[in-house]
Swiss-Prot record:
Gene name per UniProt: metN
Binding site for ATP: G38, H39, S40, G41, A42, G43, K44, S45
GO molecular function annotation: ABC-type D-methionine transporter activity; ATP binding; ATP hydrolysis activity
Name recorded for this polypeptide: Methionine import ATP-binding protein MetN
Chief localization: membrane
Species in which this protein is naturally found: Francisella tularensis subsp. holarctica (strain LVS)
Length: 350
């Protein structure tokens, strides 16, 4: 659906230049929700705006539905943009027009007959669950309702792709939840490919199939959302994941850990176990006690939801005779869970 090849974007002013996108390569599949996350200034907005050529790339190519959009002239580009819609953080509704008229605007520009416009607008109002708001003005709507109107307007010409530029950043938590649920439903019902940028990892984990993390104009990491959350590789990815799920070792534990199990007598491993899906039903902690005469004390545990998957994360201190806890670690490493040895500590120090 979308292929980005060797993309670069450089801003030049007088004698200075600023490279904001450097050799970006990625592919977005038809019908998926793809997230792009990064800190402010990382280049994510520039990348999104290149996808409809609101920003002209300095180098590289972009293919959407097998068309190289970077080669299109102005007339071809106007036609192409019907296929790629966009929604924004601040809605961009016209205050002088009511909801019906805001949604109708792109249809009017295309010269669609009024009877067809009326039918299409009310279809869209039903689709975004605002059937009774046709005559309301933007100032009479909540933030979530304004974004629903913006989404309806974006869908007026039946686009193949919807670009979302921080569409939930200005919303309260309840409205954010509603907009994300709407986007997910539109993705499934319409087969709509959605590319969204955000600085909120919570948004990514709730609706994105895959995610790319951008740092200083480059892709630092990319993969399936669940994989990225459970096993982040890049430091910037780990920092984002820690803002969304509790994977960071608490400071009061971290400062007591030793790297070497032989640093002191009677030191025992502190481990992080991550379960997801059916793996969470396995009585692994009980098995450690039953099979190896070792004790697994739970220091911290929490349950998260990532892409409709239940994920459990537990930090445990495994104590017992050295041979027993070593056997327990070997057992854990062979189970269908993620095991990470965080360090070692004495039984009375945790």
């Amino acid at each position: 659906m979308i292929q980005i090849k060797n993309l670069k974007k450089e801003y030049r002013t007088n004698n200075t230049s600023n490279l904001v996108l450097d050799n970006i390569n990625l592919e977005i599949k038809q019908g998926e929700i793809f997230g792009i996350i990064g800190h402010s200034g990382a280049g994510k907005s520039s990348l999104l705006r290149c996808l409809n050529l609101l920003e002209q790339p300095t180098d590289g190519s972009i293919f959407i539905a097998d068309e190289n959009i970077t080669k299109k002239n102005s007339k071809q580009l106007r036609e192409f943009r019907k296929k790629v819609a966009m929604i924004f953080q601040h809605f961009n509704l016209l205050s002088s027009r009511n909801v019906f008229e805001n949604i109708a605007l792109p249809l009017e520009i295309q010269g669609i007959p009024k009877s067809e416009i009326k039918k299409r607008v009310f279809e869209l109002l039903d689709l975004v669950e605002l059937p009774n708001k046709a005559n309301a003005y933007p100032q009479e709507l909540s933030g979530g309702q304004k974004q629903k109107v913006a989404i309806a307007r974006a869908l007026a010409l039946n686009p193949l792709v919807l670009l979302s530029d921080e569409a939930t950043s200005a919303l309260d938590p309840t409205s954010t939840k509603q907009i994300l649920a709407l986007l997910k439903r539109l993705n499934k019902e319409l087969g709509l490919t959605i590319v969204l940028i955000t600085h909120e990892m919570d948004v990514v984990r709730k609706i994105c199939d895959r995610v790319a993390i951008i740092d200083k104009g480059r892709i630092a990491e990319m993969g399936k959302t669940l994989d990225v959350f459970l096993n982040p590789q890049a430091p910037v990815t780990r920092s984002f994941v820690e803002t969304s799920i509790h994977t960071k070792v608490p400071d009061f534990i971290a400062k007591k850990l030793q790297d070497n199990p032989y640093s002191y007598d009677n030191t025992y491993p502190v481990v992080q176990l991550t379960f997801y899906g059916d793996k969470g039903k396995m009585p692994i902690i009980a098995e450690i006690s039953r099979q190896f005469n070792a004790t697994a004390s739970i220091i911290q545990a929490n349950i998260e939801t990532i892409q409709d998957q239940i994920v459990g994360i537990a930090i445990c201190h495994i104590t017992g005779e050295r041979q027993d806890w070593e056997n327990a670690l070997r057992f854990l490493s062979n189970q269908d869970v993620n095991l990470k040895v965080l360090g070692y500590a004495t039984a009375d120090n945790i």
